[in-house]
């Protein structure tokens, strides 16, 4: 499953869907909103936006990259859009593999690739302002065709 959703993530369902009789490992990565006071104020929430047509395609491409590189039986990547409060999940990656090494490596690869190539942008919102953060290649306007 590769999806971009606007509702809270149900990681339990993703783990259940990943279980296979030929896989002895299920590695899960869940990215959550943390209260980070590095900018002088606590983060109240994160807000995610995406260029949907490309983001959907890029998640599927990452899944194909993983399947071509590691011996895995299942890959799920789900990213949430909209407002995500402290402690809530914004991204879930679940990889099932015959052995734990490939499962861990593939899940780490997935989150790093998401940050590199998937056009999803995060806005950190504090009580006194906000900032857009991210390291994707290109800006929101460049990816969506606006200048």
Predicted regions and their residues:
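N-terminal, polar/charged subdomain of small-to-medium soluble alpha/beta proteins
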Residues: 1-90, 96-108, 112-147
């Amino acid at each position: 499953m590769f999806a971009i959703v606007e509702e809270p993530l149900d990681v339990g369902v993703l783990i259940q869907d990943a279980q296979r009789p030929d896989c002895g490992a299920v590695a899960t990565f869940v990215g959550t909103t943390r209260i980070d006071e590095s900018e002088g104020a606590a983060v109240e929430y994160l807000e995610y936006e995406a260029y949907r047509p490309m983001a959907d395609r890029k998640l599927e491409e990452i899944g194909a990259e993983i399947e071509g590189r590691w011996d895995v039986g299942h890959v799920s990547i789900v990213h949430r859009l909209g407002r995500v409060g402290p402690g809530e999940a914004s991204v879930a990656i679940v990889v099932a593999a015959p052995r734990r090494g490939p499962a861990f490596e593939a899940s780490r690869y997935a989150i790093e690739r998401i940050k590199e190539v998937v056009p999803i942008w995060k806005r950190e919102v504090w009580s006194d302002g906000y900032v857009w953060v991210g390291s994707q290649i290109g800006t929101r306007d460049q990816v969506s065709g606006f200048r």
